[in-house]
Structure formats: C-alpha cells, structure tokens
C-alpha cells in the first residue's frame, strides 16, 4: 500500500528534478573558462562550491555502477587521484595533451556541457575530472558532502571515495549525500569524476551539517597550493 508519506517524497523528488533540468537547459552560455587565475572566494549563501579546476573531457562509455567504477578507476594520467592541478596544467592521455581549466559560475551548478562545447571538445559519452580546494580555518567535524550530477559521478574528499550516483539522471540538489566526515584545518581536496551520455551535463556540490544546513565559514581556494 502506498502511503501519503511515500507520495509526498516522490512528488518532492520530481519537483527537484524538474527544477534541476530547467536550470540546466534554460540559461544562456556559461562563463568562459578563467585562465591563469588565482581564486579564493567566499561561499554563496546556499553553500555551493562554485570554483573548480576541470580537465578537458575524455571519451568513455557506460553509466551503470560497474561501468562507471571501471571508467574512473582506470589510470588516464599519473597521480590522477592525488594530483592538485593549476590552471593551464597539461596531462597526456593516450598520446594527446589535455588541459586543466579554472572555471567559476554564479549559479549553484557548473555546466560541463557548455565548458566542453566552448572549448570545441566532445560533449557526449565523455568523462570529466574536476577538483576544488576547500580551505578551513579550523577542523569541521560531522560534515556531509551533498552532490548532484548529470549524469553519473563519483566523489572523493582528501583521497577517500565518499559518494557515487549512477545511471542516466538529471541534476538534483543534494541527490547523493555522503556519510559524516571531518574537514581538517587547512586545505581539503574535493575531487569528482563525471560521466555524461548525450545531452546536458553539470554538477553541484556543497557540505551539509547535522541539521542538513549548508556548512559555511570556509573558502574555496584554487591558488598556488603545494602539490
């Protein structure tokens, strides 16, 4: 028997999905990649991470759990799970150079489709790597990474895999939420791999506290950090 609570939950998920799809498809072209920039910005009021280093897309196939895990666990370039790139850094993948770009957005999400399109790169059946640095003035225990993506994605914090969502999906705010973790004092590395099938692709991410409210009080630092 379907309960009112189940109907209410399903309706809420549907509304959020429609909101995410509309936000992705209705706005104009995304901002051009920022090059050679050192950025250290306060969070927006909802706590979304808006400043990222994104690698030009890599061709892959598959959105199921096993296909995504196989794709993200393959080594495309040295130290891909520990590398802290700078804007303009290059890596070699299958004998071709790919470049990291510093990108920022005024929205809650980062549009990966426009990122790739503006660079003249493939937008479908591709893998995006993205990295950002969360700079905490003090240790923050009990935080949870809350993410959304179109389509599948896997996320790491300080080298530990913390959340993954799979299959073809629209971006929904807080679609996947990690277990509680501790953000250490100083620099914390947030890394994600996103696989897109044909169509729009984007991500959103923020940290939530025990009351499901955005964690604030830190900055996002894409500056000249140590490797």
PLM regions and their residue ranges:
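Short beta-strands within extracellular/lumenal beta-sheet-rich domains
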Residues: 124-134
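C-terminal motif of bacterial Sec signal peptides marking the signal peptidase cleavage site
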Residues: 22-23
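Accessory carbohydrate-binding/adhesion or oligomerization-edge regions at the termini
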Residues: 26-110, 192-227
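Bacterial N-terminal signal peptides that target proteins for export
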Residues: 2-11
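Aromatic-lined ligand-binding clefts that engage carbohydrates, nucleic acids, or primary amines
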Residues: 141-156, 190
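Non-cytosolic beta-sheet module surface loops
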Residues: 136, 145-149, 194-196
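Short structured motifs
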Residues: 115-118, 129-131, 174-178
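Beta-strand-rich ligand-recognition modules
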Residues: 157-206
């Amino acid at each position: 028997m379907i309960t009112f609570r189940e109907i209410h939950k399903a309706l809420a998920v549907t509304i959020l999905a429609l909101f995410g799809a509309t936000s992705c498809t209705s706005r104009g072209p995304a901002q051009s990649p920022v090059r050679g920039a050192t950025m250290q910005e306060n969070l927006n009021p909802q706590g979304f991470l808006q400043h990222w280093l994104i690698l030009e897309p890599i061709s892959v196939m598959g959105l199921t759990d096993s296909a995504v895990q196989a794709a993200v666990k393959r080594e495309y370039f040295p130290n891909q799970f520990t590398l802290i790139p700078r804007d303009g850094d290059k890596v070699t993948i299958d004998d071709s150079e790919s470049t990291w770009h510093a990108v920022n957005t005024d929205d809650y999400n980062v549009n990966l489709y426009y990122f790739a399109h503006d660079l003249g790169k493939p937008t479908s059946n591709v893998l995006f790597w993205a990295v950002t640095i969360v700079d905490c003035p003090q240790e923050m225990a009990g935080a949870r990474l809350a993410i959304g993506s179109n389509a599948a994605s896997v996320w790491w914090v300080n080298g530990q895999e913390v959340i993954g969502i799979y299959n073809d999906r629209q971006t929904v705010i807080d679609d996947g939420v990690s277990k509680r973790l501790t953000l250490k004092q100083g620099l914390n590395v947030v890394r994600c791999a996103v696989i897109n099938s044909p169509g729009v692709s984007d991500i959103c991410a923020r940290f939530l506290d025990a009351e499901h409210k955005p964690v604030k009080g830190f900055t996002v630092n894409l500056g000249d950090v140590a490797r």
